[in-house]
Amino acid sequence: MTSSRRWWLLVTVAVGLLLISIDMTVLYTALPTLTEDLHADPSQKLWIINAYPLVMAGLLLGAGTLGDRVGHKRMFLAGLVLFGIASTAAAFAPSPTALIGARAFLAVGAAAMMPATLSLIRTTFEDEHERNIAIGVWGTMSVVGTALGPILGGFLLEHFWWGSVFLINVPVVVLALIAGAILAPGGSGRSDKPWDFLASVQVMAGLVGLVYAVKEATRPGREPLTIVIALVVAAAGFTLFVRRQRRQTHPLIDFALLRDPRILSGMVAAALAMFATAGIQLVLTQRLQLVMDLTPLHAGLLVAAFAVGCLPSGIVAGSLVHRTGPRPLIVGGLVTGTAGALLTLLLTPGVVPFLGIHPDHPLWITPGLVVAGAGMGLAMTAASAAIMGNAPAHRAGMAASVEEVSYELGSLSGVAVLGSVLGSLYTATVHLPSGSPGAATGSLDSARTTAAELSPRQADSLLDAAHSAFDNGYTLTLLITAAVLAAGSVFTARRLSLPTPAPAPAYEEKEPAT
């Protein structure tokens, strides 16, 4: 393949990844409008967001090995088709339940595409230096896409209805299909590699149980028995998955990969970077709109400061990692992200009273977001290189899937944990003025809706109390984010200082599990 053709292929797969990443966060700015139009309750709001990374995380391991079997070009193109169909269904969803289902279908297409994009890069760019740069661009697109999602959502909501945030995907999918069909190298894959669908179901059961338990545990009026049942389902799903993989001749995940500290550290760094990215953007876009009364577009543009820091740092990391190794970039990126999260909290107007930042100056948040984005760009690019650069060639599809699962688990955890903490602390700390309707305790959205029906004086008192309670949750979520990134920097620094183990022996032939 000629040099120009390789780089145009990189553009094509990067566009595919950009679509996937944008759809992870495009709803953040659309949530207030969507909630009002579809009458979604707080639980449905979180499921609308989480259905996408949840299904992706459950299917990615299977999608990687399926790509090894049928060919990564076929998986990429098939994923694009599914993504386009699901985007159309989501755009015209008539209810929260229908939108949750469409988001899950979107995730099926995304899960087919994501491992294929990275595997196509690895097989196309044979020169190590070029491959590291390509992986750097790929990794940066993932973070930039999540940062651009709120901007795109805000822009479209200024001119169209909320369904446009999904419908915009369709023409891009068509262009990527044409380019992918022309540029991507063919290959029939290896027909001797089976696809273990049951294992994907087991992972999905474990993830659904775990996420449900987290959300139930932070809900007012929680039922302990329900939480226990959800945790039992999660434990059973994950246990059955691990046992099945250890018996399989062709497992979805070779646990020997995790013995390499570089691969394990890359997985942890990728997950934590996405945890922080999703968490910061979720709570910040809500605060900018619901507390500071910014338009969706204005909120999205402010959050774009994250991408301003991420894009150049990711490209720089891609060009440096072959000389420095992943350790300084991963650890340095996580430490920088910690500082960025704390700086964002300190400079958020109205949150830290003694700094005296006036609420009419939202631009104060941008320095913290730039710093946080720069850290995530460093960490995620180095994490990609650590995983894909150290996995055996015959495990390319598996390694790509493991990396993508790390991203989705991080995003899923960020939304589930931080979103639940935000809502739970709001409900626990809101002190409504006497005579205020009880519905305002459910969420800040509900408080705003309730305030619209009150007199100006009552509305102001109610919103002051609601904003104060929301900021309690906002503060805690950013502190949790900073603490998680700091802990990750310590963990990866220690793991990456360990000696690299000898290559694991090839799998012995065993009877497939029944």
Predicted segments with their positions:
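12-transmembrane solute porter fold
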Residues: 6-22, 27-29, 225-233, 237, ...
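Extracellular/periplasmic helix-loop-helix junction of adjacent transmembrane segments
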Residues: 30-58, 292, 297-302
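Interfacial helix-cap and linker-helix signal at transmembrane-aqueous boundaries
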Residues: 34-35, 66-67, 152-160, 214, ...
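Central cavity-lining transmembrane alpha-helices of secondary-active solute carriers
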Residues: 50-64, 114-118, 304-316
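Intrinsic disorder in cytosolic terminal tails and internal cytosolic loops
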Residues: 1-3, 454-467, 495-514
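Helix-breaking motifs and short loop linkers at transmembrane-helix boundaries and internal kinks
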Residues: 39, 71, 92-98, 160-161, ...
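Helix-loop-helix hairpins in multi-pass membrane proteins, especially solute transporters
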Residues: 65-198
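Hydrophobic transmembrane-helix bundles of small-molecule transporters
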Residues: 136, 158-270, 276, 283, ...
